[in-house]
Amino acid sequence: RIKAAAGKVPVQSSLYPSPGTNKLADQLKIVAQLIAGGLKTRIYITNLGGFDTHSGQVDQTLGTEYGDHTDLLGKLSEAILAFQEDLRILRADHRVIGMTFSEFGRRIKSNASFGTDHGESAPIILFGKAINRGIIGTNPVIPIPASSTDNLAMQYDFRQVYASVLKQWFGVPQAMLDAVLLQNFQTLPIVGPFPRPALPIINQNGPVSVAGGVPERIALHQNYPNPFNPSTTISFTSTGEPVSIRVYDTLGRE
């Protein structure tokens, strides 16, 4: 079925870079091909690695406009531009929105290795014909002087963004949202009043309930290092009963 969907789209946008030069663009090209070919997959996850810039985030000689971070943002921009143009050519741009997400943010100021360490907040980029244009949030207040340990304050919980997309784009009922996210999160004006096909909702027979992932009598402590490859140390406190811990990556693999 996947091969059949891909085979229906022989011509795509010329804005894509040469294959192998932009991993994200290569993936998004395939996604556009499958969507336009009629594959019914609701959510596609693509990946652009390299943002864990503890060192070499900027070029120590040429300045902040050069370095790994600039290169990554350039690839992100290039890939999204080609993807959106491709969807327009394939007449599927009214049916697709995109969102960036990461498992960590960055600090305000660089460390001694010309990089930044893990931080408490990060920007999220949403794109597509149905997305309201503009910036949600205000310019952050940066302490003077700032140090490499200072964080930007989080303005919106990332679960607010997820709730907004699920409700405004996928049409998930509020009761189901509250059950999945474990509480009610105020939504944000992300998706505009753009005409698009109604997405069916799978009927749920009976009440929806989600059990907490960690019982109150068990304390799960921060693992280290984080992120890690290939191993990390996980510690926890319990009252002596058997405990099972499973680790999943961002693609949901155990």
Show which residues each predicted segment covers.
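Glycine-centered coil/turn sites that cap beta-strands in beta-rich domains
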Residues: 208-224, 228-247
